[in-house]
Amino acid sequence: MKTRIVSSVTTTLLLGSILMNPVANAADSDINIKTGTTDIGSNTTVKTGDLVTYDKENGMHKKVFYSFIDDKNHNKKLLVIRTKGTIAGQYRVYSEEGANKSGLAWPSAFKVQLQLPDNEVAQISDYYPRNSIDTKEYMSTLTYGFNGNVTGDDTGKIGGLIGANVSIGHTLKYVQPDFKTILESPTDKKVGWKVIFNNMVNQNWGPYDRDSWNPVYGNQLFMKTRNGSMKAADNFLDPNKASSLLSSGFSPDFATVITMDRKASKQQTNIDVIYERVRDDYQLHWTSTNWKGTNTKDKWIDRSSERYKIDWEKEEMTN
């Protein structure tokens, strides 16, 4: 089945019965992020600011923190872009065909991508997380070592000196129960992370994934009962018994490091930040003896893109 894309400038393709999920609160660590300019020693300052946008149509709250690192002893300027906020889950029953058949739209993946146009002088030099993550929680403190490099400390220490490095005020943290993070082929112009559904236990049965199959019951990922006497729309698993990302959404917390030559003639850079949600179509139908489930992958893609302008001389980032 052909994938259909929903962007922030088009109308939604789901039926009107799907309501927008309330956007969950961003991680409470936001209140600990200090904005303004900080002198971290060795002739180096860190200037931090934030930008917030809300794509109501697609249920995406984008919060970007940025930190310019100005090390007068180094020939390049650095910018750390931290992408946070919330991508709503939108786990919703979207269709009913009588009592015996119904469809559920559910989020199988969340994505964040940053991309520099090919003609930009600036380059992506690093990113966190740097690898794929399959644990429930990820945490890393970003530090600067006065050598032109930002590094991540996965012990999650906050503030002060960490070895020979100094914290720049950012500790990344996010949770992904029943999902895993995949780093998507980074280059010096593009980096992205895909947080994709892995598998899940359904009421002590399973685990089941997007491809699970039983010859009698089909895919049982979101099947509440195998033989229950209820409408199909009432036989989907309650969201409070599934991964929190399905109903409450995903709160990303990724970081990208951009470098810029101090001697470059043009000290302005454009960068695109893209948030995305991929949804599968899970169907239940009654076979005359039992319920049977099917799952169609990647049925809907909801995308929200924002272009930001970086001014390296003024140490400002705007949208």
Swiss-Prot record:
InterPro entries: Aerolysin/haemolysin_CS, Bi-component_toxin_staph, Leukocidin/Hemolysin_toxin, Leukocidin/porin_MspA_sf. Keywords: Cytolysis, Hemolysis, Secreted, Signal, Toxin, Virulence. It is found in: Secreted. GO terms for cellular component: extracellular region. Disruption phenotype: About 10-fold decrease in virulence in mice, increased presence of neutrophils in the injection region. Transmembrane segments: none annotated. GO terms for biological process: cytolysis in another organism. The mushroom-shaped heptamer is composed of a cap domain (comprising 7 beta sandwiches and the amino latches of each protomer), 7 rim regions whose protruding strands may interact with the membrane bilayer, and the stem domain (52 Angstroms in length, 26 Angstroms in diameter) which forms the transmembrane pore. Self-assembles to form first a non-lytic oligomeric intermediate and then, a mushroom-shaped homoheptamer structure of 100 Angstroms in length and up to 100 Angstroms in diameter. Belongs to the aerolysin family. NCBIfam families: hlyII (TIGR01002). This is Alpha-hemolysin.
